[in-house]
A protein has these predicted regions:
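Extracellular glycan-interacting surfaces
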Residues: 1-357
Length: 357
């Protein structure tokens, strides 16, 4: 079993699935998850340990980009505790044949762990605008489909920004999550994570205040109906008796003010919005549970049957709206009913196998 960062579906073929793994890299299935094979042909050996993300071109079948790294388990402190993240190896690679083969696409982008990649779907087909998070170096932008990259850190503090995730709103705003670099009980301002917004396609960034006391932001999602409604997830920080300032937070005014929506002792990695029913939200925590809300986070119900200790991210199954995938830290990927099973005594979710065709 291993950690995984996402389950992604080919927009032209929902049975063509990719899983982003640590330690074994990127795996693909052509039959809806019945069989799996490695998708690493052409990836430099020093990049193959971990795939952090995959992005598809929605208008060109077979065209996709991947975020690769020789270092796993980011953004956890154990990975950069003894050395600078700028010594990590990794980069962006492109595939034009649906992941059967890859080619590095790193001109202007230093060899570094790339942890996220975002495509602007409004950019010209054939010359796509892409954004990449380089851990320890910041944000990079390409306006030629990833052939060349330029650093875009204007307004981002620090010499080694732990750029982690980048999200786009319906109004064109970009939000950047910078991971926390402090650990234990030492959370100085210099070691806290951060949230930034850009309204000019990453040319300039402005700091968005985090909720009071929050130092470990992990993800940000935007309501597809309201660009001012933001959901922020966070890992708690060590307290005297329990962790604090973690969980889920919501802002209805673009980040000016925040309200807690979930237990603040929790380590919540990410939040998923159901695009068909945006009032429905999903999260997973470090308490052997995943949760579902149907009222925009006002109330949460445990997804009965899922009980792996370290939950990661919930992904909706496009082949069956009643089912979900749940990625984990160390427990592979799980698949089961979105609403859970009230009669389950133990797990009703089954692990997705990783087997060569």
């Amino acid at each position: 079993m291993t950690t995984n960062y996402g389950v992604q579906f080919d927009p032209f073929d929902a049975k063509h699935i990719f899983i982003d793994y640590t330690d074994i890299g990127l795996f693909a299935s052509n039959d809806g998850g019945q069989t799996w094979h490695s998708s690493s042909v052409g990836i430099p050996p020093q990049w193959r340990n971990t795939t952090y993300w995959v992005a598809f071109d929605p208008a060109q079948r077979g065209l996709m980009w991947g975020a690769f790294s020789g270092t796993h388990d980011l953004p956890r402190p154990k990975m950069w505790r003894t050395r600078s993240p700028q010594t990590f190896m990794g980069g962006v690679a492109v595939s034009t044949d649906g992941g059967r083969s890859w080619q590095p696409s790193n001109t202007g982008l230093p060899q570094d762990s790339v942890t996220h990649i975002l495509l602007d779907p409004s950019s010209p087909v054939g010359s796509r605008t892409l954004y990449a998070c380089a851990f320890g170096r910041g944000v990079y932008k390409s306006m030629d489909g990833g052939k060349t990259w330029t650093q875009k850190n204007n307004g981002i503090a620090g010499d080694e920004p732990f750029a982690w995730r980048i999200t786009a709103g319906q109004d064109g705003s970009l939000y950047l999550v910078v991971a926390r670099r402090s650990e234990g009980k030492d959370y100085s301002a210099a070691g806290s994570g951060a949230l930034y917004r850009s309204t000019d396609k990453a040319e300039h960034w402005q700091l968005v205040p985090l909720p009071a006391g929050v130092t470990g932001p992990t993800g940000l999602e935007i309501d597809p109906r309201d660009a001012q409604r933001l959901y922020l997830t966070a890992w708690g920080q060590e307290g005297e008796s329990a962790d604090r300032n973690g969980g889920v937070y919501v802002s209805s005014d673009g980040g000016a003010t925040w309200k807690s929506l979930f237990t603040e002792s929790q380590h919540v990695y990410d939040l998923t919005i159901d695009p068909r029913h945006p009032d429905t939200l999903y999260i997973a925590g470090f308490d052997a549970a995943a949760y579902r809300s149907t009222d925009r986070g006002a109330h949460w119900t445990r997804i009965q049957g899922f009980d792996f200790k370290w939950g990661h991210r919930v992904i909706l199954d496009p082949n069956d709206p009643s089912r979900i995938y749940i990625t984990t830290f160390g427990g592979s990927v799980w698949h089961g009913p979105a609403a859970g099973d009230p009669h389950a005594h133990e797990t009703i979710l089954t692990p997705v196998p990783v087997a060569h065709e």
